[in-house]
């Protein structure tokens, strides 16, 4: 497993990370009872970067990591996130809460669940522009660095794609890393962020499972994360990707492998696919042994200009509902 630097922090992360949300959340169909087994297997297979948040499974994700990793704390890199208040829900859903009192409380609880006295990367979770530009919040995050509670601080953009301005502002403020969506259909704003020398964690490399043939046929579900996409968008993404799938098959590759390898070609620190079980973990790790040739890369780039760019634009526009 190759390691990459997380920007200028000196932290090295495995190029393939394990996202805990897909193990403990109904949104990705994970099995909580088997989550610890997947984490342990991931470590055995060389993954040392684990991406979680306090809200994943309402604390369960962090507990799973602590239970599974045990004494390996100094051998792994843990990213967790705060800012989505699941302790005080509205209409059954967490709310954004960036008051300093809440952040102190949330971070303390995260450390308790993780059974550690520090996190490697601490990120604000889906903040709005006002939170990102807040000097009070920024200073608070950097105080955590000075106190040794966080080795680095950043911003996780979401839940959707179109947070370019917020990402750029976070970089300008001095946050050391971003987490964002990127795949060969939804290439912006990720390729803009790629130009900056910061830590970059990529999620959803399979475009809400449209680029993972093992998850087809895809259906809309209010429980699943792909509810952020219309079923019509996903169907078009699957249809437009067929020439890539067919070419890949002739070369002994799966579409999900192509999607992962294409993303790994870029200057990102770590790519975190949606891993719901041991089978997903094994096939994603095994994909790292494959290679893309120029014919596949060229076809992807051609189809982006002729087909995917319109889907990318629609994804950017859907974010307006969350701003």
Q: Model segments located where?
A:
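Conserved, mostly hydrophobic/aromatic
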Residues: 6, 18, 50, 65, ...
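Alpha-helix-loop-beta-strand connector modules within alpha/beta enzyme cores
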Residues: 62-81, 138-148
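Short, acidic/polar
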Residues: 29-42, 98-115, 160-169
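N-terminal binding-site loop/beta-alpha segment at the start of enzyme catalytic domains
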Residues: 1-76
